[in-house]
Amino acid sequence: MLIIPAIDIKDGKCVRLTRGEFDKKKIYLDNPRDMAIIWRKQNAKMIHIVDLDAALTGKLVNFEKIREIVTDLDIPVQVGGGLRSVDAVEKYLDIGVSRVVIGSAAVTNPGLVEDLLKRYSPSQIVVGIDAENGIPKIKGWTESSGMQDYELALQMKKLGVKRIIYTDIACDGMMQGVGFESTKRFVEKAGMRVTASGGVTGSEDLRKLQTLEKYGVDSVIIGKALYENNFSCQKLWYNFEKCIGIDCDFSTALKKECCS
């Protein structure tokens, strides 16, 4: 199963939210590029980036920050947040982003997904479904849609979408365990390749998700658990790595572990 570290960007900084609530954000680093390098040094094979400002406004607020990451990394980068037009998607793919995630627009403008799949490979266009109690939420999780999560997935499947990124909002950022039952229910009904997201706390959650591989879950996006060093391999890495190999001018507790 592929482990994909997440980088959420708000006001140009690397942050994590709790259940998508913007008033419950924690800043981890001032420069998201530095965070991307940390994850790459910990052997990440792909990075997942969300422009939270764009998710709210529909404008690519943090485009230049994301460009820096794509330029400096040697691994695929997937980007989501506020991608509501062909031009926005094209702008990211043109700078080397490997995969874009269509969220709100899949609900409000499914024709956009259809148009994108005429221009690009299904490996480049995926749909993100962020659900609360089985109902997809849109526009930075501030509004609910009028359908079930699996119904949206099946609609996207008919358009040619091959992969869904599925987030259980109730678990996201809570550090209380992955939404296993909700994810299992979704993948059984959707019958698609799925990247799970939201709530992974440690190795036990990964073992549980592995049991869903037979249904199509082949990867997982992890956020806060990685930032809080919940995996023993991270602790070993920080103990033996003297410097992170960047400017070491961090604004969080990571400075001590990385640069002492």
From Swiss-Prot:
GO terms for biological process: L-histidine biosynthetic process; L-tryptophan biosynthetic process. The active site is at 8 (proton acceptor), 130 (proton donor). It comes from the Bacteria. Pathway: Amino-acid biosynthesis; L-histidine biosynthesis; L-histidine from 5-phospho-alpha-D-ribose 1-diphosphate: step 4/9. The keyword Cytoplasm applies. Keywords: Amino-acid biosynthesis, Cytoplasm, Histidine biosynthesis, Isomerase. Its EC number is 5.3.1.16. GO terms for cellular component: cytoplasm. InterPro entries: Aldolase_TIM, His_biosynth, HisA_bact_arch, Isoase_HisA-like, Isoase_HisA-like_bact, RibuloseP-bd_barrel. It catalyses: 1-(5-phospho-beta-D-ribosyl)-5-[(5-phospho-beta-D-ribosylamino)methylideneamino]imidazole-4-carboxamide = 5-[(5-phospho-1-deoxy-D-ribulos-1-ylimino)methylamino]-1-(5-phospho-beta-D-ribosyl)imidazole-4-carboxamide. GO terms for molecular function: 1-(5-phosphoribosyl)-5-[(5-phosphoribosylamino)methylideneamino]imidazole-4-carboxamide isomerase activity. It is an enzyme of class 5 (isomerase). Its main location: cytoplasm. It is found in: Cytoplasm. CDD domains: HisA (cd04732). HAMAP family: HisA (MF_01014). Belongs to the HisA/HisF family. PANTHER family: 1-(5-PHOSPHORIBOSYL)-5-[(5-PHOSPHORIBOSYLAMINO)METHYLIDENEAMINO] IMIDAZOLE-4-CARBOXAMIDE ISOMERASE. This is 1-(5-phosphoribosyl)-5-[(5-phosphoribosylamino)methylideneamino] imidazole-4-carboxamide isomerase. The gene is hisA.
